[in-house]
């Protein structure tokens, strides 16, 4: 995309209470009236904060400056005092040049202080019109090299302590100087406001207040209108810049499209040339091969026998096989035109044998249509125009559906390809814009049709002494005209002399040609006639060659078009086949993924069933057997205890015996049973874990089926 350099906004007119920036390139280099920047203090003190450029420092308005300002008398402009006229330095004159006509200068009355200063300066000027001038610099080694330090300015006695020209001290080149039209208008507005505020009445009566209010109100209304006009100019300038930017962007875009189109055109032409060369080489090779096969199939002459040799063929120059294969057969054998397409038998008639001979004089036949030989046939052809040739059907170049773009895999690639195609169509429409019908006027065309803004007239500076300069310039111009006329006269004299010499040489040549004899003239006429006959024969031969070439090119073009159509059909069939193969591969991949998923689920289901069966069988074989053994042991012990006599009397009578009996029961029955239970608890958990996992799996499988459904 094309980017423009960021430009600084235009300056804004000064008004009440804000800083104004005045900038621009349409400024004049010098201006005569002084610039009043630091003026009288007023109620709107912010109006003095003015910058003459975007980079110029703002002139500070210190409170001390307002405190020291006095208004005992009006300013120089209000008092009507006019300073001395400003004269530009005169140009150096030649020693022998005549002095200009004296012009009566306008008399100016100067104050007594300035009269003394002028006399003092005149005394320093010598009688020869020269004077010495010194320059104060800041780069010096000691004070003896230059004049003593002097102040930058001085104020005469009785002068304004705060002259307006001091506002130019901090202005430099490209930082407020040189002043232009906008700066001058700003200075005039400042002076107008100062004049209005100086004319305000100091009385406190109602009439004085009303009069002051009317003056200030009119001034504010006028400044408001000027400010609105300035904003309107800024908007117009901005629109012009946008218009130029749009035009530049369109030009850059057209240039890029043109370059891209030229590049594509060169590439396509190079590819076409390469294909044409390949097809030409193949055609020549195939033609040579066909001629060789036809010659090999042709029967031998009956008079010479089967292995007879033609004496004429033996003396012919044999073709170089290496050179023939190096050139791919081009130019090795001239194509022969025969009336028959295949070989015949040896018993064919002589008429048929003569028909198989090549037609060596085929170029002498005129292939031009018979109707083009007389005027009536040409008129009839012009009257009966064939619509099929004269005009083309509107749907002949209908753009088919772009399969190349639609076959792209991603949407981003299709969008980018569509954008490129649209850009190429846009470039084609731009190139053939005159052939397309008139379209609706767009916004950019309206911008282009808009006339360019006219530059305002630059303010001119009229100084004293311009009349003398005009007289001097007119005299100089008159001298140049006189000298130029003299040089022009010399040029025309030389031209006339050359013309006379040329006429003399032509007359001598004509006389020499007239002195020749009749035999020489007749020989020259015969030579010209022979040249004309040779030119006519050459033109006729050239016409025959061009006609044959065009005929061959027409048939070759038809063949190339058929080949291109077949190639397009082949590409289309390959694209359809590739698309179908990709679709089938995608379906196969989905089926394979589903099959693998089902196989994994089935293996997990079988493994869970096997774990459940194993856990159940283990529980059946181990736990049930132990329980049965435990029950049998308990039952046997109970039966044994029933058979023993009751020891209750002995136990109750003897406490030591009872204690021993309890200890024996604990040692033999209780403690071993507890120890066995503690040791067998992990093994029991290991046995019951698969059953618990199988139960959880059975509970989770119905939930998953319900979520899938």
UniProtKB/Swiss-Prot annotation:
Keywords: Cell projection, Cilium, Coiled coil, Cytoplasm, Cytoskeleton, Flagellum. One of its GO terms (cellular component) is axoneme. Residues 94-116, 333-360, 690-709 are annotated as: Disordered. The keyword Coiled coil applies. It comes from the Eukaryota. Pfam families: CFAP91 (PF14738). The keyword Hydrolase does not apply. Disruption phenotype: Knockdown of CFAP91 does not affect the cell morphology and the flagella appears normal in number and length. However, flagella exhibit an abnormal axoneme with a rotated central pair complex (CPC) and an impaired flagellar motility. Belongs to the CFAP91 family. This is Cilia- and flagella-associated protein 91. Axoneme-associated protein involved in flagellum motility and central pair positioning. It is found in: Cytoplasm, Cytoskeleton, Flagellum axoneme. InterPro entries: CFAP91, CFAP91_dom. One of its GO terms (biological process) is axonemal central apparatus assembly.
């Amino acid at each position: 995309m094309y980017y423009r350099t960021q430009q600084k906004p235009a300056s804004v007119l000064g008004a009440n209470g804000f800083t104004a920036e005045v900038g621009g390139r349409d400024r004049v280099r010098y201006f005569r009236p002084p610039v009043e920047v630091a003026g009288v203090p007023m109620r709107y003190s912010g109006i003095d904060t003015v910058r003459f450029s975007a980079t110029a420092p703002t002139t500070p308005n210190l409170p001390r400056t307002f405190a020291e300002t006095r208004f005992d008398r009006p300013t120089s402009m209000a008092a009507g005092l006019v300073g001395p006229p400003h004269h530009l330095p005169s140009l150096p004159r030649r020693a022998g040049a005549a002095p200009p006509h004296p012009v009566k200068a306008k008399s100016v009355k100067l104050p007594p202080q300035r009269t003394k200063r002028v006399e003092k300066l005149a005394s320093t000027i010598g009688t020869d019109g020269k004077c010495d001038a010194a320059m104060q610099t800041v780069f010096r080694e000691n004070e003896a090299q230059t004049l003593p330090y002097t102040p930058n300015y001085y104020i005469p006695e009785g002068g304004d302590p705060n002259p307006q020209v001091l506002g130019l001290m901090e202005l430099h080149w490209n930082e407020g100087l040189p002043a232009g039209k906008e700066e001058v208008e700003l200075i005039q507005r400042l002076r107008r406001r100062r004049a209005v505020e100086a004319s305000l009445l100091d009385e406190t009566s109602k009439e004085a207040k009303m009069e002051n209010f009317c003056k200030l109100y009119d001034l504010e209304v006028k400044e408001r209108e000027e400010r609105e006009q300035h904003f309107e100019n800024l908007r117009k300038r901005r629109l012009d810049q946008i218009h130029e930017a749009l035009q530049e962007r369109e030009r850059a875009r057209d240039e890029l499209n043109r370059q891209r189109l030229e590049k594509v055109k060169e590439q396509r032409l190079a590819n076409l040339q390469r294909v044409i060369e390949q097809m030409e080489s193949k055609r020549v090779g195939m033609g040579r091969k066909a001629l060789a096969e036809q010659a090999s199939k042709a029967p031998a002459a009956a008079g010479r026998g089967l292995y007879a040799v033609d004496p004429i063929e033996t003396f012919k120059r044999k073709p170089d096989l290496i050179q023939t294969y190096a050139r791919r057969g081009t130019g090795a054998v001239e194509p022969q035109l025969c009336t028959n397409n295949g070989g015949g038998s040896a018993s064919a008639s002589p008429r048929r044998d003569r028909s198989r001979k090549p037609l060596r004089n085929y170029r002498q036949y005129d292939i031009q249509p018979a109707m083009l030989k007389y005027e009536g046939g040409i008129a009839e052809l012009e009257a009966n125009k064939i619509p099929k040739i004269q005009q083309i059907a509107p749907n002949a170049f209908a753009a088919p559906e772009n399969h190349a773009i639609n076959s792209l895999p991603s949407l981003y690639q299709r969008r980018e390809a569509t954008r490129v195609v649209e850009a190429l169509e846009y470039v084609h429409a731009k190139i053939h814009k005159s052939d397309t019908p008139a379209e609706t006027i767009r916004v950019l065309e309206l911008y282009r049709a808009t006339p360019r803004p006219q530059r305002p007239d630059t303010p001119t500076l009229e100084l004293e002494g311009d009349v003398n300069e005009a007289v001097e310039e007119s005299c100089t111009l008159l001298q140049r005209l006189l000298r130029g006329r003299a040089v022009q006269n010399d040029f025309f004299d030389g031209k006339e002399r050359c013309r006379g010499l040329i006429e003399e040489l032509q007359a001598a040549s004509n006389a020499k040609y007239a002195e020749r004899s009749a035999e020489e003239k007749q020989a020259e006429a015969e030579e010209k006639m022979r040249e004309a006959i040779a030119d006519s024969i050459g033109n006729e031969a050239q016409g025959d060659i061009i006609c044959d070439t065009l005929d061959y090119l027409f048939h070759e073009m038809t063949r190339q078009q058929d080949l291109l159509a077949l190639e397009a059909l082949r590409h289309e069939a390959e694209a359809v086949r590739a698309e179908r193969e990709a679709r089938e591969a995608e379906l196969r991949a989905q089926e394979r993924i589903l099959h693998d998923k089902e196989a994994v689920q089935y293996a997990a289901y079988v493994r869970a069933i096997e774990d459940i069966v194993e856990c159940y069988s283990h529980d059946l074989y181990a736990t049930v057997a132990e329980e049965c053994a435990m029950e049998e042991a308990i039952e046997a012990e109970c039966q044994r205890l029933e058979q023993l006599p009751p020891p209750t009397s002995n136990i109750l009578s003897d406490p030591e015996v009872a204690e021993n009996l309890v200890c024996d029961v604990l040692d033999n029955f209780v403690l071993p049973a507890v120890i066995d239970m503690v040791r067998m608890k992990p093994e029991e958990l290991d046995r019951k874990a698969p059953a618990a996992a199988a139960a959880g799996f059975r509970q989770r499988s119905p939930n998953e089926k319900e979520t899938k459904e």
